[in-house]
Design a protein with these regions (language model features):
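N-terminal active-site segment of His-dependent metallophosphoesterases
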Residues: 11, 16-64, 73-80, 152-155, ...
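Active-site environment of divalent metal-dependent phosphoester hydrolases
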Residues: 26-30, 50-55, 72-77, 99-104, ...
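Active-site neighborhood of phospho(di)ester-bond hydrolases with catalytic His/Asp-centered motifs
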Residues: 21-23, 43-49, 66-71, 93-95, ...
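Single conserved hydrophobic/aromatic residue that forms the stacking wall/gate
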Residues: 1-15
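Binuclear metal-dependent phosphoesterase catalytic core
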Residues: 31, 86-87, 110-117, 139-175
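Short acidic, glycine/proline-enriched helix-loop-strand junctions
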Residues: 58-66, 131-145, 150
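Helix-adjacent hinge/juxtasegments
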Residues: 66-111, 115
Length: 175
């Protein structure tokens, strides 16, 4: 919805929407809570492998909280995948394991193209990715609990939409 624009001090840019994007927390809250304290955000997207913490996480988010089921969420009532609108952008949220993301991005890329979305958000690999192919953003925030990329720092992503409705994504790391 429409909300007051928050302008960054000393900057021309005004922020419309900021989403904290996380995945693969695997039942652990400590790094997620640190990321939530560190960032200002209007909503959260969790790309799966929540492992029973969905109600607790939702209770800590003051705004929309979109979550999907991962391959380790056996007894979850979360949806396997969802499509939502974030400002003017169509987002497809999935854990990614059903699209072969461990082998590469081609499967998830093809699915996102077939759905006509602007951004696809997924997890599963525990390795962060934020790349734009044409008009499509492909985003994996990595894992806050069990990072697997070089250096193995816990990671998440921030999705920002400015007052010109421009979308940007940044991968961030906890030390």
């Amino acid at each position: 919805g429409i909300r007051d624009l928050r302008c960054l001090v000393g900057s021309e840019m005004c922020i419309r929407d900021r989403f904290l994007i996380v995945s693969d927390t695997h039942g652990r809250m400590y790094n997620l809570e640190e990321a939530m304290e560190r960032e200002e955000f209007d909503g959260m997207i969790h790309c799966g492998d929540v492992e029973g913490m969905d109600d607790l996480i939702k209770s800590k988010v003051n705004g929309p909280c979109y979550m999907v089921m991962g391959n380790n969420d056996w007894f979850s009532n979360l949806p396997a995948e969802i499509q939502v609108n974030i400002d003017d952008y169509r987002a497809f949220i999935t854990h990614g394991h059903n699209y072969g993301v461990s082998l590469g991005l081609e499967g998830i890329y093809a699915e996102a193209l077939s759905r006509g979305v602007d951004i696809v958000l997924f997890g599963h690999t525990h390795r962060p990715v934020a790349e734009k192919r044409g008009n499509l953003w492909i985003v994996n925030p990595g894992s806050l609990t069990y990072p697997r990329q070089m250096g193995r720092k816990p990671s998440y992503a921030m999705l920002t939409i400015n007052e010109e409705h421009e979308l940007s994504v940044e991968i961030k790391y906890l030390d």
